[in-house]
Amino acid sequence: MQADFVIIGSGSAGSALAYRLSEGGKNSVIVIEAGGSDFGPFIQMPAALAWPMSMKRYNWGYLSEPEANLNNRRITAPRGKVIGGSSSINGMVYVRGHAEDFNRWEELGASGWAYADVLPYFKRMEHSHGGEEGWRGTDGPLHVQRGGFTNPLFQAFVEAGKQAGFETTEDYNGSKQEGFGLMEQTIFGGRRWSAANAYLKPALKRDNVKIVYGLAQRIVIEDGRATGVEIERNGRIEVVKANREVIVSASSFNSPKLLMLSGIGPGQHLQDMGIAVKADRPGVGANLQDHMEFYFQQVSTKPVSLYSWLPWFWQGVAGAQWLLSRGGLGASNQFEACAFLRSAPGLKQPDIQYHFLPVAISYDGKAAAKSHGFQVHVGYNLSKSRGSVSLRSADPKADPVLRFNYMSHAEDWEKFRHCVRLTREIFGQSAFHDYRGPEIQPGEGVQSDEEIDAFLREHLESAYHPCGTCRMGAKDDPMAVVDPQTRVIGIDGLRVADSSIFPHVTYGNLNGPSIMTGEKAADHILGKQPLARSNQEPWINPRAAVSDR
């Protein structure tokens, strides 16, 4: 088997790459995917979002090493093992990120990836339904919508934000990237609109695109050039030959793992694993970043939450309605209100993110209390804590070693304490007067710094936004893995394009910027002139120096 371009991974970036590299029919593309089909309601029905993440069929099922600052808990670290990758098992929340995120990328050496550079690619990929005119794309492959916003608890949340003195925004993916407002979703026609549905399946209708199901073992490197990929398929080892380039889009865990298995990474670590060093790049696997969050939960005194739909019978009713009409509760992820807030005056951008949910549930999807309730997922999104990905052994089937070092920076504790107290202030506004019952979690007895810290150690979880482990930077940066054209430094014919190349975590969910990365990388790979830089300037809060807390 051979193709001009061989892409490892059919996730958010990999699917976009397959679509763009194969346009026009000139170039042949093979996509290697370790997982399988996304057929069925567990993935396609938006309200079933908790299911695929808990199923080994769709999820690599990784765990972190014991986290010292979180009571030595091993934190779940899911990644999609299915066409569409993590876009097929995620929460379907669409966030581009803040303009400052991408300007920071350029400051860190990713020349040509500032906000003005990436905004045209966000527009190219989007088919926005109801976004801000002039700031959003309207004919791209990725459908982005807003929910019905019919539950009164959503409206109470946004109104409470206004009462607390915060901004509101009509479109946080438009010019005003701060405040309370409606959440955007990658849902279309009542279905999850994953990267597979948006990009990969249309690409596979072309004669020049093929998907091969198998586990990538290593990249074949000959005389300093990547020439193919060794895969295991149906119990046999095969080589997929790349006539032009190999592109790794296997996730922030598996992209560095695959590079290291191929001899690209920290030299001493590779030698310890018995792997011949092809390129000593100490940045491979370093710089692991993520978002953390916790659930803040409140009893609702009125029966307006989704609690009534949690019993199996009513879940079945919702599922049947969705199967028949692609409508009803099954057609929404139920994340329809959100907020992006600054935790202190003087900050250039928001650093706290809220997802509001009109039900109080635990991480396994079960009711947190035997009553109606509501909750927010809240987290500090600009942590300075950094971790790493390394090899457990030279066996391609062995899980990578994930050390996040969560909460290893003193500022993290300060910011998360602030999240607890700020959420109490928001839920304490008069907008929630008709709904606010007792606090379920953290609990009204959790007040002091020490009590809050104890709660956080036991209840903080990953928001599932890992990135940064094959960092993009200047060619002379010893910790950079790829240059701003996404080429692996030191090896010809090899690129990485996914969230692993992010120099710094973006503020918000990562599916959107990961797809953008695939879109932009495709132009670099094809030698095209990048899309013209945007001259649009995002809104700046005129009260930024004195407002918020």
Curated annotation (Swiss-Prot):
One matching Pfam family: GMC_oxred_N
Keyword Aminoacyl-tRNA synthetase part of the UniProt annotation: no
PROSITE patterns linked to this entry: GMC_OXRED_1 (PS00623), GMC_OXRED_2 (PS00624)
Pathway: Amine and polyamine biosynthesis; betaine biosynthesis via choline pathway; betaine aldehyde from choline (cytochrome c reductase route): step 1/1
Residues given in the record as FAD binding sites: 4-33
Cofactor dependency: FAD
UniProt keyword list: FAD, Flavoprotein, NAD, Oxidoreductase
Active site: H465
InterPro entries: BetA (IPR011533), FAD/NAD-bd_sf (IPR036188), GMC_OxRdtase (IPR012132), GMC_OxRdtase_N (IPR000172), GMC_OxRtase_C (IPR007867)
Family membership noted in the UniProt record: Belongs to the GMC oxidoreductase family.
Annotated NCBIfam families: betA, PRK02106.1
Role summary: Involved in the biosynthesis of the osmoprotectant glycine betaine. Catalyzes the oxidation of choline to betaine aldehyde and betaine aldehyde to glycine betaine at the same rate.
Protein name listed in UniProt: Oxygen-dependent choline dehydrogenase
Gene from which this protein is expressed: betA
